[in-house]
Structures are given as C-alpha cells and as structure tokens.
Amino acid sequence: PVARVIVFHEAEASLGTTSRQWMELARHHLAGALPGTPFVGGTDGNFAELNRQPPDVSAMDGVSYTINPQVHLTDERSLIEAIEAQHDTVVTARGFCGALPISISSVTLKPPFNQAAREDEAPPDPNELPPAVDPRQMSLFAAAWTVGSVRSLSWGGADSVTYYETTGWRGLMETEQGSPLPEKFRSFPGMIFPVYWVFAFLADARGAAWLRLRWDQPLLLDGLAFQQGDRLGIAVANLQPRSQEVHLSPAPEGEATVRRLNEDTMAAASTDPASFVQQSETLAVNAGQVVHTLKPYETAFFEFKLV
C-alpha cells in the first residue's frame, strides 16, 4: 500500500515549498486511484526552506522536509552537535502546521543534491564518489549517529521518518555487485552496514512502548529504550572515537544480555547476521546498576527481563 504521496514541483522543490496549485493538481489526478492516502507537501530541501516559506497547510494532509547534518561542516563532532537540532526542527514546524503529521523524508548523511546550484552542474567525476555519498555510511559512526537521530526526531514529535536507502552506498547494506568505487567506498558485495542493526533493533520493538533515557553528557552518548511485555530493550551509542564507561540505572534486578556492535564484532555483523545475533554477553546487575565499557563508536544493545 502507498503510505503517503509527497508532492513537489521540480522548479520549487529545493528552494521553496509546495504551492497550493500543485497539491490540488496531484490530488485531482491521483486521489481516485489512492483512496484514503494522505497528500503531503513541503520541501525537498532543508528545514530552512520550510521555515522561510511556510506552506499553505490548508491544502495538505501533512508536511514534509529533509534532514542532513552536513550543510556546512563535515567533521564527526559537527555531525554529533547537529543531532539535537533535529528535535528543534520538528518543534518549530509544529508551530505552523498544527496537528498535521510531520514526515521527515528523508534523513541522509550528506545533502542529496546541491541546493546552492543555480545552473546545470558539470557531470560528476566518475573516479570520485558522488557528492551525495559519504564513505562513513558503512561505518560504526553512522550507526551511532543514527541512534541519536532517531531519538532526537522521535522526542521532537515527528510522525514518520524515512532514512537512507535500502542498498548501495547510501543504504543499509551493499548490493550484490558491490561498490562501483571500492577504493573510495570500501565495502564488499553483500556487506551489511552497521546502521542496519539500528533498524533491526527498531523492528524488533514494533508495537512496544518507547521510553525516555536521560544522560548527563549528551554529546558523548545517545540512546533508545523500549518496553514490550516483560522485555526492556536499550540501545546505547558511543558518539566518541574513544572508549567510555557507561552506567545504566536503575536496572531491573537479575541479569542482562548485551550484543555489542563495535570494531571487534563488525566482521560478523557485516557478513554473518545469524552469528552476530547469537553473540550476546551476560552482564550482572549490581545494586540496580549495569556498568559497561563502550568501545569507540560502539552501539550496544541491552535486554533485561522484567519480573
């Protein structure tokens, strides 16, 4: 089924927001074939375009915009500092779209195209990565950053979020053919990228109640938590290129299991998902607390049994 139709006009999409006439035209031609499907408008550009030119929401069933953390700077610290701003974009958008659903479509590590271009650009160099491709897509850093992004947007109140692509160098796993430029994007055919496991964690929590975590160093760690029946699941991401000790409390008494996505387990996570899923460690809960050392850019998936 079609979840939603997002309407853009090619001449407006990247620099402004969807005009009422295009919303009405799309609805006129498509609504009969897609009964009950919401028609969403907004911008194919950044939140700045939406904020500068709020759309006529009376013609829309929802509002959409894109997010990427590399409009200005590309270093890891800047990308981490951009995580919290994602929450703020949703809160600001809520101010002019009211109760309409907010769809972030999509979230990417790099801008999908050059919004600053005012004329046709020269063809990309076939020996270089396309401008929209970040070689960190296949990295542990991307997985940790994505944990923070999901947390930030969900806490902000986004109704739906589309991330990345399914396969290829902007996706969750490599294609069967492999990277077109393996010397620049160092994946291998069929490789499962670390970010895949963040979405596996989310999929495993379908229908669960999501909980809020609190931490005292927001630029060092990020995380997600859910409760589903007697299961308590927590994903903790190390946002730093150094090891860090994390204390989880209050933790249910008994034992916890943890599956670690880090430099030691990445080989199995990338090639043998069945094996990686079985690579869990048992941790003791002492005085209502679990202590765990996260390796650089590690994402650790904890599970507790509630009694």
Where are these regions (language model features)?
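Aromatic/acidic polysaccharide-binding cleft in carbohydrate-active enzymes
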Residues: 103-196, 213-219
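Carbohydrate-binding surface patches
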Residues: 216-253, 258-265, 300
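C-terminal beta-strand-rich structural cap/linker in extracellular carbohydrate-active enzymes
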Residues: 273-307
